[in-house]
Design a protein with these regions (language model features):
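Conserved helicase ATPase motor motifs in RecA-like P-loop NTPase domains
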Residues: 76-82
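Extended catalytic-interface subdomain
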Residues: 323-324
């Protein structure tokens, strides 16, 4: 089977490159920057991609590449930092006068194979500080911008190619075409990878790993945890124990809905824990989003461990902790690389650190759309497979600032109206994720000829393939008007509704 190796130099979106290659039907594997040329040779890839990274190639502790890799006679594409590594090795890289972030127009000087099927002017996404100032010997410039003299370059004889921009993000419209050119026309890779028999493979791996032991798992009801739980359940049956912890920040009627869902899927060992009071008590007067995440994460561990110890007395063979962790969770927690900048903590990634159980993460190498495809193959109901993502900390990170009972009740009602109207209008399945958030400020309004001073609700709906990048959804005006009208009339404490039109990046999908 053909494969492309993506070498990660600490980029938050290195996995996005990996995902894009898989989308092309070619298997790709992500490895760390300190991999040796010998190991690369053994993997025998059709091509190599060098990712971007948050540091300068000249920083003292910046990640470097085994220079022998550049001489393996395997096609290599350097993206951003990856281009600069090639440029540093063969030419000269200088710090840019200004860091360049956002959309830019490139002028293509020579299409070559890498940029074939592109127009003379194309929009791309830049995110860099350094730039290759002088063209390395025997390289050719393929494209430039008004501020970047070498936006793309190649050395066909050495099979080295470089892009200063990011083809993997949606903000580079022809990015997939460029990757396709590299993978199929330069690397000559074969389109021979798909989910295929992955469910059976994962189920067998779980059987082999767990053996005669049992697994305990937090069941949130989301697509990730439900697909992971279903795989584990099919592998070990009644040896799986699922615990649903209500931390008080879940959506309206969520607890009842989740428990009923798992019962319909014939899960036998289900346990409900109402821990809302302890969570809300510990969140009193806490405004910092990272502190909120950590408090929720630590309290979740404490509550979960307490339940696990109770169950362990009855079921002493519980030795594994099942989790629905997927790639984006790990990326945003900067787990794959010491060089990566942390965006925010994910409590399901840090959970095992304080527990003595072995971790079982059947979905850790998959992306959300692949998880959904798995869910379909496992014949899970559509409303589970295409359920919108919901963060572990729940509404606590959709309430900006302090979490109070009043704010929670307001947000639960507003969120319920938003979801209900999206479903009624047949838009729920057309967006990747939709959410309501409460801003911790009040604005002046008028209701019934009286002055009001109440909260703002922000509505957000995005389209995406894998949550690594996202665009705001163009919901129709009439639908937004209806949702806004209902919230303003039915939810006490709100006098203003706004719609968020931010992309990711630079914004994240969630607010905190």
């Amino acid at each position: 089977m053909s494969q492309i190796i993506v070498i990660n130099f600490g980029s938050q979106i290195a996995h996005l490159i990996n995902r894009r290659i898989r989308e092309l039907g070619v298997y790709s594997e992500l490895v760390m920057y300190n991999i040796s040329a010998e190991k690369i040779k053994k993997l025998n890839p059709a091509g190599i991609i060098l990712s971007g990274g948050p540091t300068s190639v000249y920083d003292k502790n910046s990640p470097q590449i085994d220079k022998k890799i550049l001489k393996l006679n395997i096609p290599i594409l350097g993206i951003c930092y990856g281009l600069q590594l090639i440029g540093k090795h063969y030419g000269k890289v200088l710090p840019g006068k200004l860091k360049e972030y956002g959309k830019k127009q490139i002028s293509i000087k020579k299409n070559g194979i890498l940029l074939q099927n592109l127009k003379e002017q194309e929009q791309v996404w830049m995110s860099h500080g350094d730039l290759v100032k002088s063209l390395p010997k025997d390289f050719e410039i393929l494209a430039k911008t008004d501020t970047c003299p070498i936006a793309a370059m190649e050395n066909r004889n050495k099979k080295l190619y470089g892009l200063q921009f990011h083809p993997e993000v949606i903000h580079t419209p022809k990015g997939m075409q460029i990757l396709k050119n590299f993978v199929f026309d330069i690397c000559k890779a074969k389109k021979d990878w798909n989910i295929g028999n992955l469910p059976n493979k994962l189920i067998q791996e779980i059987k082999d790993t767990v053996g005669d032991k049992a697994v305990i798992m937090g069941a949130s009801g989301g697509v990730d945890s439900t697909v992971a739980a279903t795989l584990i359940h099919k592998a070990i049956g009644r040896k799986l124990h699922c615990v649903f912890i209500d931390h008080g920040m879940i959506r309206k009627s969520e607890a009842k809905s989740v428990m009923n869902r798992f019962k319909k899927l014939n899960f036998k060992n289900l346990y409900f824990v109402d821990a809302s009071k302890i969570f809300l008590k510990r969140l009193e007067n806490v405004s910092d989003p990272e502190k909120k995440r950590k408090i929720i994460g630590h309290t979740f561990i404490e509550v979960f461990e307490k339940k696990e110890k109770q169950l362990e007395k009855k079921f002493p063979n519980i030795k594994f902790l099942g989790q629905g962790t997927i790639y984006p969770d790990r990326i945003e927690s900067a787990q794959p690389s010491k060089q990566a900048s942390k965006i925010k903590s994910h409590h399901n990634v840090t959970l095992p650190q304080k527990m003595k159980l072995k971790v079982l993460e059947p979905l850790k190498e998959l992306y959300k759309d692949e998880v959904r495809e798995l869910g379909e193959k496992l014949k899970l109901p559509k409303q589970i497979v295409y359920r919108h993502p919901f963060p572990g900390p729940g509404l606590a990170i959709r309430i900006l600032g302090k979490v109070t009972n009043e704010r929670l009740e307001i947000l639960k009602e507003a969120d319920a109206i938003f979801m209900e109207e999206l479903k009624k209008a047949d838009y729920y399945d057309k967006v990747w994720q939709a959410l309501a958030a409460l801003f911790p400020i009040k604005t002046v309004g008028v209701k019934g000829d009286a002055r009001t001073y109440e909260y703002i609700i922000s509505l957000r709906a995005v389209t995406s393939k894998d949550a690594m990048t996202a665009d705001w959804s163009r919901l129709p005006d009439w639908l937004l008007e209806k949702i806004s009208s209902r919230i303003l009339n039915e939810v006490k404490g709100v006098n203003r509704v706004v719609y968020d039109i931010s992309q990711k990046p630079p914004a994240t999908i969630e607010y905190e």
